[in-house]
Amino acid sequence: MGQLVSFIGEIPAIVHEALNVALIAVSIIAIMKGLINIWKSGLFQLIMFLILAGRSCSISIGHHLELQHFIINSTSLLPSMPTLCRINATNSLIRGPFSAQWGLDIFIGDLTILVNPEPGSKTKRMTATNITGCFPNNEDPDSVAQVLSWFFRGVHHDFHLDPTILCDESVTVFRIQMNLTERMYCDRIVSKLARLFGSFGDYCSKVGKKLVIIRNVTWSNQCHEDHVGSMQLILQNAHNQVMRFRKLQNFFSWSLVDSAGNSMPGGYCLEKWMLVASELKCFGNTAVAKCNINHDSEFCDMLRLFDYNKKAIVNLQDKTKAQLDSLIDAVNSLISDNLITKNKIRELMNIPYCNYTKFWYVNHTGLNVHSLPKCWHVRNGSYLNESDFRNEWIIESDHLVSEILAKEYEERQKRTPLSLVDLCFWSTLFYTASIFLHLLHIPTHRHIIGEGCPKPHRLTSDSLCACGFFQLKGRPTRWARIP
């Protein structure tokens, strides 16, 4: 310790000698380069893997880079409309308008709960003019009847020609049964349900009874609401409304304004009421400029959606009956039909598709710079795991880093002489001889033999992972190294 203190005290005198300055510089460079080479050899990664094996599935995509996302809040975007969501393969849900605390559970299966009414039974036949007769004791029969009317029109049910709908009520719970046993009727109803909630597979080809059961339930966040499904419900009711058609153009430049019509030269902010569980999120002029170049981005489609319909969105805040008519008038302005059709085709082909609800982007937390958001795709009614599109966000992070480095290089060229950069480069190159540790090929993580890279999952020696993704114990593993 005394020698170290003496050395530090002599530094002012040492730096007067050019050779001593060179020795200090070489020593610092050698130590730093040695640490970097050890890191690149994989030794630190191996130690980190052994500590976190079986406990963590996280992965870093670079210094200060994080994968983040935001979710559009459909209840604030379309407050007067019922919102739709999918719970599982057989159950879907329609939530009442204005964030109601009740909803309608749509069950598709083969369980018969109601039979044709007999004298003295509680079972009734539903008619187009007396929907409320199925639930006279409900607290809000008019709202429930309105949602059911929209639903039946959306699936194109004809009360005069199609099979009779049965219903009954017990205290505050009512049940409605649609019989889909007739093949042509089943194909028509299920195809319309698929447009609202997603594919139900080849349901109508099954043998036996085929039924849709509707019952009222209490809303308790059973699933995440999908505003695209609500728009589909509007479109499928469009034959009852007078609509003006307008489609988004493919190639044009556009600017942004706030909800009051004032110009926003600094970029665009998604207001807090548009997002789920997130604060105000702003995207600068860089993102807007990218949207003028990249016309295939789902995020840019969403920006156009909000930008073209500022007045419509402001009107949606007035909870009046006239609001519904103006919403029907503006539905083709809210989102282009070809975008919905494109994603529905991808859904039918079992290809991950965009539901225009959740978007991901790579954010550099140190510089507060982010990439252009991209759609978080959906398959079979659920969002893809981060590892399913790992290559995409790693490539996106590489592009973001390249943009940052290019910008920093241009700025540094204005302040730093090129000769100084060359001097640093050649002095660093001299010490690359310490890269011999790369010859050791130290492994960094485990692979299951015969399968691809399990990253970001960290497998134990029993081939398990704490997140539950790898559950089969005792599979043969081998050590591998990050390329």
From Swiss-Prot:
Keyword Zinc: yes
Sequence positions that bind Zn(2+) 1: C57, H457, C465, C467
Transmembrane segments: 18-32, 34-53, 423-443
Disulfide bonds: C85-C223, C186-C204, C269-C282, C291-C300, C354-C375
Residue numbers on the Cytoplasmic membrane side: 33, 444-483
Residues of the site described as Cleavage: S58, I59, Q249, N250
Annotated site (Important for GP-C-mediated membrane fusion): K33
Lipidation (N-myristoyl glycine): G2
Comment block on domains: The cytoplasmic domain of GP2 plays a role in ER location. It also contains a zinc-binding domain that allows SSP retention in the GPC complex by accepting a cysteine from SSP as the fourth ligand.
Name of the protein in question: Pre-glycoprotein polyprotein GP complex
Taxonomic source organism: Bear Canyon mammarenavirus (isolate Mouse/United States/AV A0070039/2000)
Origin organism lineage: Viruses, Riboviria, Orthornavirae, Negarnaviricota, Polyploviricotina
